[in-house]
Structures are given as C-alpha cells and as structure tokens.
Amino acid sequence: MRLGTRQTRYEPARRECGRALTESRRLTGPAGDIMLAARSLFERQGVAKTTVKDVAAEAGVTRELVYYYFENKQAVIDAVLDDYVEDLVESVIVWNESRRFGDTPGSLRACIATFRRALYDAEGNPRPMIGVLEELGERDAFDVRAVRETVDCINDNIVAEYAAYHQVEIEFVYEMFCVVIFGLVGLVKINPAISDEALMKVVEQTLHLDMEPLKAPEAGGAEGAGETAKAGDAAGEAPR
C-alpha cells in the first residue's frame, strides 16, 4: 500500500461514483499514524521546516517505514491535504446524522454552526489547516476541491431526500450549492462578525428553502419513508 505512486498534487476531486454517508476515506493503520504525525508537525512548525526524519520521530517509526508507505515528502503532504478534505466532508455527515425530521430552522442553524466550526475555533481564529494551506500556496485549489467533494456528498445523499417532502424551487441545484458554500466562505472573510442568523437567511433565500415545519410520516406510510424521514427537511442541504 505505497501511497506515493499516485499523482502528487491532488487526486481528481470528482470520483466515478459518490460515497455512502457511512464511508470514510481516512488513512488508517501505520500510514494513518504517519499522516497524523505530519499533520501535527505542519500545523506546529510549518511544512518547510518539517523533514521526513521529523515525521518519523513524531510517529515513533523509522524513516524506512515512512518511505514504505509514502514515496516522498510530497506524498505525505498530499495525504495531509486529503485528511483536511475528509474533515470537512465528515462534518457534513455528522450534521446530517444530527438532524430531526421537520425541524428545518433547527437543521439550518446547526448547518451554519457546523460551517463555522469547520473553519474557525471558538475565538473566531482560523483553524491550523488554513496556515498550512497558505504556506503551500494551495488555499484556492483546496477550496475548489473541498467544495466539490462536500457538494458531491450533499447532492448524492441528501438532495433527493429533501425533494421527497418539499417543492424544489431552484434549477441547477449542484451549481447553486457550490455558489452557496463559496459565498459563505467569502462572506465570513469579508465580515467575520456576521451573525449566524444572517448567514441562515442568506442560505434560505439563495436556495429558496421551505422553512415550514413538517410532521414525521406515520409508520407504515410510503415506501422508503422510514429511510428518509430523518433527513427529509434537509435544511441547509439544498433542494433539487
């Protein structure tokens, strides 16, 4: 399982197929431990100052084992970037699991809170990954990839569930989600003090979300209702 034989910048952001909401793409085992050690070092002391020897020492392994799993330092960097993307996609998955059927305003509020936590700490400071991305000069490219994979997750797994219970009032659903996520990132950069309520209104108006509460479907209702009940309102996810 040597990881450095792939293209060293980024794998294609669009897969041939999407992922299930239970699927994780994080590295595990020794390769995952090495990647996490590198991530910690990059965030503490910077990428340029971190050597493969440093990564091996942090992970408690030999340099030979690092090179067994990763062709070179660039491959380690790629793995860390992949892990950052996974952070963002998993935050969407966790948010989806926490939603209550019919509580559109509550779901949207939780969505905005998830967005803030993904990028900023409790004091409003950027997460350490932002510094790593800026040092690498990869902020814009990373944003494109992260938005694509996040919207892929939403589009493949959540949009149809919203449409099962709501009238969809927008076209180009996938593209509108890209606009919303890029827009939220830019809006918070311009105005870090903007309230969650204002961000919620931006999402609601842009996606034309139906904010009326819904009652849970009765047991034994339409086929598949049990599977989609929890995610039916899909606030913050996007109608189609």
State each model region's role:
Residues 1-29, 216-240:
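N-terminal intrinsically disordered/low-complexity leader segments
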Residues 29, 33, 37, 41-75, ...:
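Helix-turn-helix
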Residues 33, 75, 106, 110, ...:
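Amphipathic alpha-helical interaction segments
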Residues 79, 93-123, 177, 200:
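Hydrophobic alpha-helical connector segments
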Residues 82-88:
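Short, basic, alpha-helical segments at the C-terminal edge of helix-turn-helix-like DNA-binding modules
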Residues 89-93, 139-167, 171-175, 201:
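Amphipathic alpha-helical packing segments from all-alpha helical-bundle domains
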Residues 110, 114-145, 186:
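Amphipathic alpha-helical segments used for helix-helix packing
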Residues 168-190, 197-210:
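Hydrophobic alpha-helical segments that form the core
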